[in-house]
Amino acid sequence: MDENIIINILRKEMMPGLGVTEPASIALSSAKAYEVIGGEIKNIKIIADPGLFKNAFSCAIPGTKEVGNEMAALLGTICGDASLGLECLRKIKKEDVSKAKTMLDKIDIEIKSQTEGLYVESIVTTNNGIGRTIIRYKHDNIVLVEKNNKILYQKENNLNKSNNFSQEAIDSKKITEMKLDEIVEFVNNVNYEKIEFLLESIKMNKKLSEKGLEGLGIGLGKLILESCNENNYELYAEALTCSAIDARVSGAPVPAMTVTGSGNHGIITTLPLLAIKEKKNLNNEVLARSIALSYIINIYIKEFSGKLSAFCGCAVAAGTGVSAGICYLLGGSLKEIENTIKNMASNITGMICTGGNLACSLKANTGVKAAFLSAKMALNNIVIPNKCGIVSNSIEDTMKNIGRIAYPGMMETDKEILNIMIESSK
């Protein structure tokens, strides 16, 4: 495959995001809908797919102590700046939060069960009429903007039912045409300058981690760091990862570099690699190459599991990605990278997702632990053999199988998780 296609996919899948991306997506959609209509707000209606609704259900809104779909929509409408994309709530003020709390009776939320992929629709009614926005497939992919039933903007083909994926999604799907040996060959041989941009994720996510070490969220990252000695890069990796996620899910006003639409995925696919790089005094080039591998494996799996799913994509998809990156950084061969992925597939695949919340850092820690264990096993010639569980004869089928566990495998599980969350909130 043309290396420029791979590089473009990596660039496209990377994006700064403030807070968890699902409430940010709701806020962005609402901000854009209000932007085109303006006026005194009378009603806001949000229609979201079950996965997006679940992930935003109990997640903190950046810069506030508020959580959930309703507050994300209200704040997006009241103070969101759509030009900032997934950082649209960057300019939030205390008075905006106070105003939003007085308007909770003006919002309606509907779950759109019969939809494929990510979906959020915002309908904002004011004294000037109705503004409507639809986001599809990617968290910031606005495909329709209407003002009083007049189309102001529409992405060609994106609302056509026969076209299940946007052009952006089709591009990323090309990753699944690659064999693992082709992926590793790209990682080894691509000109460093062409992938140096991947280090931007390290800078951004490290700042978020430092914020989390102040004790935000459940304080797991801070707790782990306190028991970490100077040379233990595994515990250091867990601490960096968990503290960044602690900060993110608790609403810290610091962006993460997302990948495949998720800040947590972006954190897990990068910070454990930074931990190894720092503790072993490695150079930036080998770090960038390991990130490229981590990202590509994560993207590969996510193309089969979907952007949002019943399993914890952070621990499973991103965890598998970073396990390959860890093996690479520790000097692993192609065969050892393959065996690392087999070990991960046999370990935590199937861990459920209960949305973006304070428990995310706990699941992330499990994913990072499993990633290091899988790599160490492979580097010591320990591997789960083919035809054992979901491990297939080809590593590409094994990665596909990881995704298949989520979709279609766990679709009923996802529904039941959402039902439990809604019941528990009453």
Swiss-Prot record:
One of its GO terms (biological process) is L-cysteine catabolic process to pyruvate. GO terms for molecular function: L-cysteine desulfhydrase activity. InterPro entries: Ser_deHydtase-like_asu, UPF0597. Belongs to the UPF0597 family. This is UPF0597 protein CBO1815/CLC_1757. It comes from Clostridium botulinum (strain Hall / ATCC 3502 / NCTC 13319 / Type A).
